[in-house]
């Protein structure tokens, strides 16, 4: 049996739609979904997906580039699935330059932010937050933020602007390396079904 880690929230609907097209229909039992005797899904927080795989609780998962880079995982990443593309960005108050000297940066992604600052040669004080990061510059908590944006609407509503694009965020299929060895046939069969669905979807779009 394959065990999948499915992220709750914005990616959940897209992932479940893909699985349904691949022939998997699930019956819900609290946060566990079962598809016959072949596949079990755990519905988990996006940031917990790599943990479920790393500790061998799940064989395959779905998570964003942001989670993979923040967690610094060594999971196999065979391909990504088509979802709305978002960006990890550095943003600050509109019309203001990036401050000289030490920069205070609020973020939900301290590891990504630390590596970004190091790559720029910046001396930064990183302020980890769980909630609305875009409020930090307004409140005077930080000079800048590092956060995810899709349309830029939330930034504009808070009088912020993008100062730098750090990377593009996609939704990756990830595989536990041990599962890839011990359940190779099951894993490959599952991945091929997903790829076939995506291939057919792309074919339909190109002929519209």
UniProtKB/Swiss-Prot annotation:
It comes from the Bacteria. Pathway: Amino-acid biosynthesis; L-histidine biosynthesis; L-histidine from 5-phospho-alpha-D-ribose 1-diphosphate: step 1/9. Lacks the C-terminal regulatory region which is replaced by HisZ. This is ATP phosphoribosyltransferase. GO terms for molecular function: ATP binding; ATP phosphoribosyltransferase activity. Transmembrane segments: none annotated. Belongs to the ATP phosphoribosyltransferase family. Short subfamily. Catalyzes the condensation of ATP and 5-phosphoribose 1-diphosphate to form N'-(5'-phosphoribosyl)-ATP (PR-ATP). Has a crucial role in the pathway because the rate of histidine biosynthesis seems to be controlled primarily by regulation of HisG enzymatic activity. Gene3D superfamilies: Periplasmic binding protein-like II (3.40.190.10). InterPro entries: ATP_PRibTrfase_cat, ATP_PRibTrfase_CS, ATP_PRibTrfase_HisG, ATP_PRibTrfase_HisG_short. It is found in: Cytoplasm. It comes from Thermotoga neapolitana (strain ATCC 49049 / DSM 4359 / NBRC 107923 / NS-E). HAMAP family: HisG_Short (MF_01018). It catalyses: 1-(5-phospho-beta-D-ribosyl)-ATP + diphosphate = 5-phospho-alpha-D-ribose 1-diphosphate + ATP. The gene is hisG. Its EC number is 2.4.2.17. Pfam families: HisG. Heteromultimer composed of HisG and HisZ subunits. SUPFAM superfamilies: Periplasmic binding protein-like II (SSF53850). GO terms for cellular component: cytoplasm. Keywords: Amino-acid biosynthesis, ATP-binding, Cytoplasm, Glycosyltransferase, Histidine biosynthesis, Nucleotide-binding, Transferase.
């Amino acid at each position: 049996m394959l065990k999948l880690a499915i992220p709750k929230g914005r990616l959940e609907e897209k992932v479940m739609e893909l699985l349904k097209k691949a022939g998997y229909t699930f019956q819900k039992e609290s946060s566990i979904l079962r598809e016959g005797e072949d596949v079990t899904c755990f519905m988990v927080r996006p940031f917990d997906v790599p943990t479920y795989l790393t500790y061998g609780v799940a064989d395959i998962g779905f998570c964003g580039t942001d989670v993979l880079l923040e967690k610094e995982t060594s999971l196999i990443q065979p391909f990504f699935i088509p979802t709305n593309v978002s960006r990890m960005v550095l943003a600050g108050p509109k019309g203001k330059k990036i401050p000289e000297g030490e920069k205070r940066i609020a973020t939900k992604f301290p590891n990504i932010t630390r590596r970004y600052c190091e790559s720029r040669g910046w001396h930064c004080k990183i302020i980890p937050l769980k909630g609305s990061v875009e409020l930090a510059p307004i409140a005077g908590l930080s000079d800048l933020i590092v956060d995810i944006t899709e349309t830029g609407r939330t930034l504009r509503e808070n009088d912020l602007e993008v100062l730098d694009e750090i990377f593009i965020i996609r939704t990756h299929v990830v595989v536990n390396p041990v599962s890839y060895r011990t359940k190779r046939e099951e894993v490959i069969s599952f991945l091929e079904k997903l790829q076939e669905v995506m291939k057919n979807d792309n074919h339909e779009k190109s002929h519209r």
